[in-house]
From Swiss-Prot:
The gene is alc. It comes from Acinetobacter baumannii (strain ATCC 17978 / DSM 105126 / CIP 53.77 / LMG 1025 / NCDC KC755 / 5377). Its EC number is 3.5.3.4. This is Probable allantoicase. HAMAP family: Allantoicase (MF_00813). The keyword Nucleus does not apply.
Length: 336
């Protein structure tokens, strides 16, 4: 059976620093749906791009990589409630109908609510996307203008049909309750995000903060071969400022293309704009001086860390180029 892969899609640059709050890898899950007869709603939250497998059928019909409901034979519409992996402010939506050509919804709307205890009884749902027409086999990017914090969303499709992927881009909101807990302050699920980078030819630096170890070489940050003096770099914001106790640099799957060395610079800045950070980052002090790298290996540093009471942003320098899979900054959230 031939397998077709989704066409390459370039996310709008404005969303490159946002987190997909509906990513199953950080805990997003389907709570309830009106119907998922042809394809389970949870597939809609998968990180991987959708595929189409020719001649693949199951007991319900054609297998589709997404959420698909049966044909509606009465008035009404279908819906799906999703608990976001982390609460946050929503900036944009991507309703992706890739490979749904004769079975995509005519239109869709989306509501959101804040229910931190998970009880949706009496929840106040806000409309963040009015009923909007959809097209076949394509991404639909919708910007959202709402400053509220949300924990759940409800996707409504009219009248029925299928959605390959639903992505909800925004900024993670973390309510600090424990300043003594050690956690990865850079992790995607804790609000870490990419601000800028020198190059991302083979893999985007947003992969550095993904959950778990990299699944392959494509699930990491990899730059093109450098043919001029210098080195590659990326700037990231921690989800919360804190004191760093342990650093992990993982070169999983990078064997003939790992960097010779990696160093990390750091700074603590309150209310800094992303634009002002980029030119100043080259002058930040070192949190970790240049360390030699090995192929396909987790490098751990504790005693090598240069002391900072608070860190809010880091700059990772990959000398001179190459690829790394993950970076973890273990520490405690700083007290105000």
């Amino acid at each position: 059976m031939a397998t077709l892969h989704a066409p390459a899609f370039e996310l709008p640059e404005i969303l490159n620093t946002k987190t997909n709050l509906a990513d199953a890898r950080i805990g997003a899950q389907v709570i309830e749906c009106s119907d998922d007869f042809f394809a389970e709603a949870k597939r809609m939250l998968q990180f991987e791009a959708p595929i189409f497998v020719e001649d693949k059928f199951d007991d319900h019909g054609k297998w589709m990589d997404g959420w698909e409901t049966r044909r509606k034979r009465h008035a009404g519409y279908d819906w799906c409630i999703v608990k976001l992996g982390v609460s946050g402010k929503i900036s944009a939506l991507d309703i992706d109908t890739t490979f749904f050509t004769g079975n995509y919804p005519a239109s869709a709307s989306l509501e959101a609510c804040y229910a931190p205890n998970g009880d949706l009884t009496g929840a106040k749902w806000q409309s963040i996307l009015e009923n909007t027409e959809l097209g076949p086999s394509q991404h639909h990017i919708f910007m959202v203008n709402n400053d509220a914090i949300f924990t759940h969303i409800r996707l409504n499709i009219f009248p029925d049909g299928g959605v390959a992927r639903l992505r909800v881009y925004g900024d993670v909101h973390i309510q600090v309750t424990d300043h003594e807990q050690t956690l990865d302050l850079l992790a995607l699920e804790n609000g870490g995000r990419v601000i800028a980078y020198s190059d991302a030819h083979f893999g985007h630096p947003r992969n550095l903060i993904n959950p778990g170890r990299g699944v392959n070489m494509g699930d990491g940050w990899e730059t093109k071969r450098r043919r001029a003096p210098g080195y590659d770099w990326c700037i990231l914001a921690l989800g919360k400022s804190g004191k760093i106790e342990k650093i992990e640099i993982d070169t999983a799957h990078f064997k003939g293309n790992f960097p010779a060395e990696v160093s990390i610079q750091a700074v603590y800045l309150e209310n800094a704009t992303d634009a002002q950070l980029i030119p100043q980052s080259m002058f930040w002090s070192y949190l970790l001086e240049a360390q030699p790298m090995q192929m396909d290996h987790i490098h751990e540093y504790v005693n090598e860390i240069l002391q900072y009471e608070k860190v809010s942003h880091i700059r990772i320098n990959m000398i001179p180029d190459g690829g790394i899979s993950r970076v973890r900054l273990w520490g405690k959230i700083a007290k105000s």
